[in-house]
A protein has these predicted regions:
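Terminal alpha-helical anchor/extension segments at protein ends
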Residues: 1-142
Length: 142
């Protein structure tokens, strides 16, 4: 049986599913879930105040930079996990579902060999959707 994993992720959370198939039916089984709480911090938690002055633009740039950094950290963590899983032979095919920015970050953090296992990359944020909605985006051939 070919093991296909589906990774549904965004900048602060991810879920990993395995495709379960029988003769007439395909379903998803959730294997793991991840959260990156630092990425989910609110603006006020990051800067400690609600200043309204000429520094707002600089503050916004700083917060955007922080968000980019945290998104990259989470992509590295998830990429490392997937690289290890591939080394252990836990999947044979990998389907990625993520918003474009995080999808790019994640692909950069997958090893060359792990990237070879990616059979589909879908640039949609489905991490908060139910299993049926996620499954509807998986091509039937997987």
């Amino acid at each position: 049986m070919s093991k296909t994993w589906v990774v549904v992720a965004e900048s602060s959370r991810a879920k990993i599913f395995q495709v379960e198939k029988n003769e007439s039916h395909q379903s998803l089984k959730e294997l793991e879930g991840f959260t990156h709480s630092t990425s989910r911090s609110h603006k006020n938690q990051l800067n400690g105040s609600q200043q309204k002055d000429s520094r707002d633009s600089q503050l916004t740039d700083s917060l955007d930079s922080h968000k980019d950094h945290e998104r990259g950290e989470f992509a590295r963590t998830l990429g490392h996990h997937l690289n290890n899983a591939r080394n252990k032979g836990l999947f044979k095919k990998l389907i990625l579902m993520s918003p474009p920015k995080f999808l790019g970050d994640l692909r950069k953090n997958l090893g060359h060999e792990t990237n070879k296992f990616v059979v589909s990359a879908i640039d949609k944020n489905l991490v908060r959707h139910n299993i049926q909605e996620i499954q509807a985006h998986i091509p039937a051939r997987y």
